Amino acid sequence: MSLRMLLSTLRRHSLMPILVALQVALACAILSNVLFMVQQQLAPMLAPSGIAGDELILIDQMTPRQHPWSAADVRRGEQALRQVPGVRDASAAFGLPMVSGALMDMALQGGNGAKVGVNGYLGAGLVKTLGLQLVAGRDFLPEEYRDFGMGGVGNAPWDAGAPQPVIITRALAEQLFDDGQALGKVLTDPGDADDHGYRVVGIVRHLLRNQLSLAIDGRSDNTVLLARRIGSTSLLSFAVRVDPPISEATRTRVAEAIKREFGPTMKADVIPRISSYAERRANAFKSHRAALWLFAVVTVTVVVVTVIGIMGLTGFWVQKRTRQIGIRRALGARRAHILRYFLIENALVAGSGAVLGMLLAVLGNRLLMRHYELAHLPWRYLPLGALLMLVLGQLAVLGPALRAAAVPPVAATRS
């Protein structure tokens, strides 16, 4: 049968095709947005951290009772932790993966003019403590560090006119420079009027940012290490690298060292949080896993309802046209012809529904952006959702189409 005759048949019996197309359109709109939201939840979970996660104990929520801790207090704390049996290294830090209490965000601009939002980590010896892999350049030299005081108190000034040394990730280097060659180059902060720039002295393979909500669309490694050691501070965090696997005895000794060094000057009603990186990661992604389960239920429900709906409507349509199918068989149509006819017919109906569904997906995404701060739906999810609906439509119509192909020519003589 020609395409013109097929379209003519659809126009004469338009109710069933319209119902199928509307069902496909609604399912396509839902699936396109759900697939996008699944990717948003999965992206930070699948992003490589770049650190020795199975060897890290993270300590935060440390606040002083009265006056801020001095740089000397922080140095004594680091030394006390390094002397704990089983501890390989320890660094006081401002900003760590899976630690959201201390957050530094900034914008960097490189050779290609692009402004890239990044998270900054500060602390002496973080490359070694976190177990980062340098792929180019070097670690900071001891004489390059300057004290960083919270609120600007105790900040050591940088050399006049000299750019600060920084270590960035390989992904960030590729965003800031078209050729990815950032080593030795100077970056700028467009939002800082007194900025003298940042000279890249090293590049690490990966380092996960601590703003997990932004760790999507290739931005999970938008992280920079600054040559600053923790000075005067009223909010203290430590990264402690221990011999694997992390034992309860080592964790207890680390907690005792913190209590011994900072207990007398620490707020009694604020208990420091001491846990492994794996525990922090599990807690940080708890809401992501719950969302993924919800999206899985929605996806399965939409798929099942769509398939059942198409099968039911198409089956009813086949039943109504049994005599017409029998006439075609009597006129010489083979089973393969009947099967192909229904598959093509379904592809046309589902295809038109998918086109409408892509438009509905965009409109639905606009509503979600307005009311729930969802990101803009990338265009690639539109054809993906449409393709899924076309495949589902073909699978759903296969059963009724096979039954139609099995109709004998004698059915044309039945009333």
Give names to the regions the model predicted.
Residues R4-R11, L15, I308-V349, A406-S415:
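Intracellular coupling helices
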Residues H13-Q40:
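Short, strongly hydrophobic transmembrane alpha-helices
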Residues S2-L3, G385-S415:
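C-terminal membrane-exit region of the final transmembrane helix in multipass inner-membrane proteins
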Residues M1, S8, R12, M16, ...:
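Membrane-helix entry/capping segments
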Residues L35-L172, D192-H196:
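Structured, solvent-exposed hinge/loop segments at the ends of secondary-structure elements
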Residues L35, V298-I325, L395-A396, P400:
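A hydrophobic alpha-helix feature that marks transmembrane segments and, especially
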Residues E78-Q79, Q83-V84, P163-Q164, R170, ...:
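"Rare, low-scoring activations can occur
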Residues V302, R323-M369, L384, L388, ...:
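Transmembrane alpha-helical interface segments in multi-pass membrane proteins
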